[in-house]
UniProtKB/Swiss-Prot annotation:
GO terms for biological process: D-xylose metabolic process. The keyword Isomerase applies. It is an enzyme of class 5 (isomerase). This is Xylose isomerase. Mg(2+) 1 binds at residues 230, 266, 294, 337. One of its GO terms (cellular component) is cytoplasm. Belongs to the xylose isomerase family. HAMAP family: Xylose_isom_A (MF_00455). It is found in: Cytoplasm. Its main location: cytoplasm. Its EC number is 5.3.1.5. The keyword Magnesium applies. It catalyses: alpha-D-xylose = alpha-D-xylulofuranose.
Length: 435
């Protein structure tokens, strides 16, 4: 069955096009700094928002029109696979991502759930072999089922912990089966409501134990994806242990996981943590731990995870600059963890929304390339920190100074002359680079 019969494969037509179903900026084969746009951006489509989100919210029922709903959960699951790969092919997107419960119904037992996963991943593998589309990453949903009300790896119930471990094992088996390049952990329930009844160290020790089990099992089955942790400060938990990039890096380093784990960073999660997206990317990059990103945007006027499709060229430009500074993001990618707005309920809105996101990242990539070619930020920073290139500054950097010698220097010299940073001018010039 064809689900989008009136929509052809999306092609690049430039900014003068009147065709809704065309890329205005994303030209997959355009060469940017020695690589094609497709190689730089490594786009992925998220199975959950694309295939399972129905448009309902706490105040209203489902509104999304979807023609792949079947008479049984397994029939719906199979139809979703066919429709999903049609979307991927029409967008010419090479990668996809999913949680286990996105693709297969849980059924009435863990055994039935795993059997359903096996059947659906057989179909997914057929479509992957047929199309050449690849799995960027998969993960286990260990936050939706009521059993995880007190956490998965951080739970107070050992039997729940065992089920979480079983889901991770199955997830890694599926990752090997489908050739997954990364494997993600997101701890939506790994946190606490109150410290009154919480042993934080015990819970974090147990989370680390599960991560080490995952590393060991991957090695045992001969499959070594890049493991990724996705930070988020809150929602659904009041206080999540993977609060932001810096907090998560502290966890990774404390438990000696840095050889196997990097970060999967989401723009909207940065907003919830009180950071810009480029801040989170910069922190991860400085640790050598920028692994992959979830592309979306939040609404700074709202206090929850809105997961809007990214259309802010300014923010995306600064994000792409960090990725270029990182030398790229492979084997990670740019996964659209984004959902259409409730009023965008037609099936074709799924394609239009991804076109918008892909065009925005293409513009951000070109803007970031120009910034790098002109050394815009590099020259600014070199000038700003120039006092450390010579004289006493160079001696400080080389380790030749100490508190006593610097005190003597300070006492012999006049009060330093402080220079303006001209921030408003810098921001004004930055606007000239936005395509």
């Amino acid at each position: 069955m064809v689900y989008f019969p009136k929509i052809e494969k999306i092609k690049y037509e430039g900014t003068n096009t009147k065709n809704m179903y065309a890329f205005r900026h994303y030209n997959s084969e355009e060469i940017i700094m020695g690589k094609t746009m497709k190689e730089h951006l490594r786009f992925a489509v998220a199975y959950w928002h694309t295939m399972t989100q129905d448009g309902s919210d706490p105040f209203g029922k489902a509104v999304n029109k979807r023609s792949w709903l079947g008479e049984s959960p397994m029939e719906t699951a199979k139809k979703r696979v066919i429709a999903f790969f049609e979307i991927l092919e029409k967008l010419d997107v090479e990668y996809f991502c999913f949680h286990d419960i996105d693709i297969a119904p849980e059924g009435n037992s863990l055994k039935e759930f795993f059997s359903n996963i096996d059947e659906i991943t057989d179909l997914i593998k057929e479509k992957m072999d047929e199309t050449g589309i690849k799995l960027l990453w998969n993960t286990a949903n260990m936050f939706s089922n009521p059993r995880y009300v007190n956490g998965a790896a951080s739970t107070n119930n050992a039997n729940v912990y065992a089920i979480a471990a079983a889901q991770v094992k199955k997830g890694l088996d599926v990752s090997k089966k489908l050739g997954g390049e990364n494997y993600v952990f997101w701890g939506g329930r790994e946190g606490y409501e109150t410290l009154l009844n919480t042993d934080m160290k015990f819970e974090q020790d147990n989370i680390a134990r599960l991560f080490k089990m995952a590393i060991f099992y991957g090695e045992k089955i001969g499959h070594k994806p890049q493991f990724l942790i996705e930070p988020k400060p809150k929602e659904p938990s009041k206080h999540q242990y993977d609060f932001d990039a810096a907090t998560t890096m502290a966890f990774i380093l404390k438990y000696g996981l840095e050889k196997d784990f990097k970060l999967n960073l989401e723009a909207n999660h940065a907003t919830l943590a009180g950071h810009t997206f480029e801040h989170e990317l910069n922190v991860a990059r400085n640790y050598g731990a920028l692994g992959s990103i979830d592309a979306n945007q939040g609404d700074v006027l709202l206090g929850w995870d809105t997961d809007e499709f990214p259309t802010n060229v300014y923010d995306v430009t600064l994000a792409m600059y960090e990725i270029l500074e990182n030398g790229g993001i492979e084997p990670g990618g740019i996964n659209f963890d984004s959902k259409v707005r409730r009023s965008s309920f037609e099936m074709e809105d799924l394609l239009l929304a991804h076109i918008a996101g892909m065009d925005t990242f293409a513009r951000g990539l070109k803007s970031a390339m120009k910034l790098k070619e002109d050394r815009f930020f590099e020259d600014l920073k070199e000038q700003r920190y120039s006092s450390f290139k010579k004289g006493i500054g160079a001696k400080i950097i080389s380790g030749k100074e100490n508190l006593e010698s610097l005190t003597n220097y300070a006492l012999k010299n006049d009060e330093p002359i402080i220079e303006s940073s001209h921030i408003e001018y810098v921001k004004n010039i930055l606007n000239d680079y936005l395509y």
